[in-house]
Structure formats: structure tokens, C-alpha cells
Amino acid sequence: MIRILVSNDDGVNAPGIKALTEALVEIANVMTVAPDRNCSGASNSLTLTNPLRINRLDNGYISVHGTPTDCVHLAIRELCDGEPDMVVSGINAGANMGDDTLYSGTVAAAMEGRFLGFPAVAISLNGREFKHYQSAAVYARRIVQGLLLHPLASDQILNINVPDLPLDEIKGIRVTRLGARHKAEGIVRTKDPAGREIFWLGPPGLEQDATEGTDFHAVANGYVSITPLTVDLTAYRQLSVLQNWVDKI
């Protein structure tokens, strides 16, 4: 049976990772390794100045006092009994679309899996109430099975966003590009109980590019979006432009 490594950024006790693990154990041997706390927004950060401590839980999951990227790196390099066939991250409580992907620990966990040489998928549930993790879990299993039967090029990560709808209300799957958001809203300034000044980052901006073909548009219209992402951040179309600029300075 195939081996799948599951991780997330919401933490080892989050309902999304439980739904994902339970869906995938029907088709694979699953190892679940996730942060011991919520690490939303951790992006691709690694812990380099402190040791990583683990805790083996009664349900078989392993919690790590580290980031999502730490979890995947540690699991593949040390904790897994043999290499996984795939890394699946999620199910995130909240969408990871457009610019969100730059900050997302969910996407970063998948990216670390891909960076280490394995097919990788990130899956997130759009919405505010998060009632339908099972819908996302069904699509996660379907897409993972599809990857096993029909492998894709190994240089991509599949970023999946699922509308928070009952399964029978989801219209299907659309292949999308990343949309874009407006700038995040302002900083919230307040004081702690001792009267010291503290700051909270404001909520993300509203959609700026949610046109047809984007992940925002697909999910808003009841479809699951799948966006291929790459680890290589090179802006290839700008190479010749940059070379011309360098030649002038």
C-alpha cells in the first residue's frame, strides 16, 4: 500500500487534519505529523535556533513544536518508516488563494514535500463557518487517487481550494490561476491589560483580481479550484528585460 505523509498549519488537533487523515487511510498508510499549535501564516519558515521536540499522541499522530515546514522536513528525514509516496497538507480552515499562498503554512508544508522530491498537494476549505470538512476530504481523496493513477510532472504542487458546501452542491473542479487581493487592511493599535501598547495585523484585503479563470472566481461560483504552483520563483519572462536593463547601467 502507498504511504502518504499528512501535515498542516492549523495544528495537530485541528478538525481539518482529522478529516483528511480519515479520508486517506481508506487508500493508503498515513503518517500524520503536524505542529503542536496553530501556525497559520508561518509560510516556509524553518526552526534553526531551537531543537524540535515531538510528542507521539494516542491517536498515532505526532506533534512537533515547530513550523509546518519543520514537520514535513523532520518527518521525511527522520520519522517516516520509509519515504512517503506523497505529501498532503490540510485541510486548512480558510482559503489559500491568490496572495495567500505566499504566507500559507499549509502551502509551505506541501512545498517542502515537493522540495524534498515528492508529489505534494495542499487543500483548504473556503468560508467562515467551516461546516463541510467532509466535502473537502472527499475531493482530497479523489485528487490523490487521480495523482496515483495518472502522475503529473514532479515540479508542481497542486493547491486546492474547496467551497464550504455540502458535497452534492459542489459543481465540479476547475483548473485555475492565482487571483490577487488588495493590500491588507491597517494595523490595529490597542493596549494590553497592563497599559502597554500592542499591535494586531489587520485582516487581509478584499479580492482585487477575481476574474474568470482565477481561484477566487471558481470557489465563489461553487467549484473546487486546482492551481499548479512551482517551487522555482524565477520570473522567466523578465530575464531578457532584466538583461537589457543591466546592460544599460
From Swiss-Prot:
Its EC number is 3.1.3.5. Its cofactor is a divalent metal cation. Keywords: Cytoplasm, Hydrolase, Metal-binding, Nucleotide-binding. It comes from the Bacteria. A divalent metal cation binds at residues 9-10, 40, 92. Binds 1 divalent metal cation per subunit. It is an enzyme of class 3 (hydrolase). Disulfide bonds: none annotated. This is 5'-nucleotidase SurE. It is found in: Cytoplasm. One of its GO terms (molecular function) is nucleotide binding. It comes from Shewanella sp. (strain W3-18-1). GO terms for cellular component: cytoplasm. Nucleotidase that shows phosphatase activity on nucleoside 5'-monophosphates.
